[in-house]
Amino acid sequence: MNTLPQHYPLRVFYDGQCPVCSREIQRHLRHDRLGHLQAINIAAPDFNATAYGLDAQRVHDVMHIVTSDGQVFTEVDAFICIWRALPQRLDRLIFMTLLRIPPLRKLADLAYRAFAKNRVRLFGGCDSNRCQPARPVR
């Protein structure tokens, strides 16, 4: 993770067709009293990844954050950027501290990748702002 100071606003690219992703971004936006986060739905019909300098396939595979100066953070690093942008709370501070421990960080990276790869299969999808139930896991 880059240790440079944050450059706000952070553009948060999230999958609006993923119920869990949508719920989490809404929760983060509610806590963002200073307006540091700008949520961009990659499932919107007019979304164009290349307009932001991002790879279209990769941005659909994992969460991305782009800082105001163009730095790109993905996966767990993207979550850390969000947590840093929000008012400090004990739970976020604990998560960020634990993620400095290499084995825990590796585990978090693996867990995130598994979630990202299977999010629609596990949690269903949304269409026209209405979420559909998840398909049974077989």
Sequence positions of predicted segments:
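Short cysteine/histidine-rich zinc-coordinating motifs and their immediately flanking basic loops
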Residues: 30-34, 138
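Thiol/selenol-based redox catalytic cores and closely related redox-interacting motifs
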Residues: 47-138
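A structure-centric signal for secondary-structure junctions around beta-strands
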Residues: 7-9, 36, 59-60
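Short, low-complexity, intrinsically disordered N-terminal peptides in bacterial proteins
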Residues: 1-8, 132-138
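Thiol-based oxidoreductase modules, predominantly thioredoxin-like and allied folds used
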Residues: 34-48
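Generic secondary-structure microfeatures
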Residues: 16, 25, 41-43, 67-69
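Local sequence-structure signature of Cys/Sec-based thiol-disulfide redox active-site neighborhoods
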Residues: 2-31
